[in-house]
Regions:
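Conserved Rossmann-like nucleotide-cofactor binding loop
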Residues: 16, 41, 144
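N-terminal Rossmann-like FAD-binding beta1-loop-alpha1 element of flavoenzymes
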Residues: 3-35
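Short, glycine/charged-enriched secondary-structure capping and boundary segments
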Residues: 24-26, 48-51, 115
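Short, solvent-exposed loop/edge-beta patches enriched in aromatic
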Residues: 26-30, 39, 93-95
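Glycine-rich active-site loop/strand segments that organize a redox cofactor
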Residues: 38-88
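Feature captures the FAD/FMN-dependent oxidoreductase FAD-binding
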Residues: 73-146
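Core residues of folded domains in eukaryotic genome-function proteins
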Residues: 4, 29, 42, 115-117, ...
């Protein structure tokens, strides 16, 4: 079982996780962080659901990132447009190397003695468990359980 420590673990690489990572990188540049994503792609809901008429229920001027204004004239965006927006945000911020794909958190324990979180994470590709420790866990897992 491998072990690694970072200051912050972000769980989920959807819209919330990408936003959290952006703010960690820009507002806390001295802090180390990783993003754990259970699937093999960023985007969460917007990557998972690919039926032809998927679209946002909220306008993208509100749903989008404050640090990356939505520029498309369509306020209610389709899924592929939202995915393009998210991919661009990850690319522009250089976040791809911070994302560990195929990682599912199976247990999180707080150690008062060590003053950190210890997470047991399943690598779904190798089926091996990894142990990661951190000072903070930022849960960005979204609404759906997949």
């Amino acid at each position: 079982m491998s072990s690694e420590h970072v200051d912050v673990l972000v769980v989920g690489a959807g819209i919330s996780g990408i936003s959290a990572a952006h703010h960690l990188q820009t507002q806390c540049p001295d802090k180390s962080f990783l993003i754990l994503e259970g699937r093999d792609s960023i985007g969460g809901t917007w990557d998972l659901f690919k039926y032809p008429v998927i679209r946002s229920d909220s306008d993208m001027y509100t749903l989008g990132f404050s640090f990356r204004p939505w520029r498309d004239p369509k306020a209610i965006a389709d899924g592929p447009s939202i995915m393009s927006y998210l991919r661009s945000a990850v690319e522009d911020d250089g976040l791809h190397d911070k994302i560990r794909f195929g990682r599912k958190v199976v247990k999180a324990l707080w150690s008062s003695q060590e003053a950190h979180w210890e997470l047991t994470v399943l690598n779904t590709r190798s089926q091996q468990e990894e142990t990661l420790t951190c000072g903070f866990v930022h849960m960005c897992t979204g609404y759906y359980n997949y």
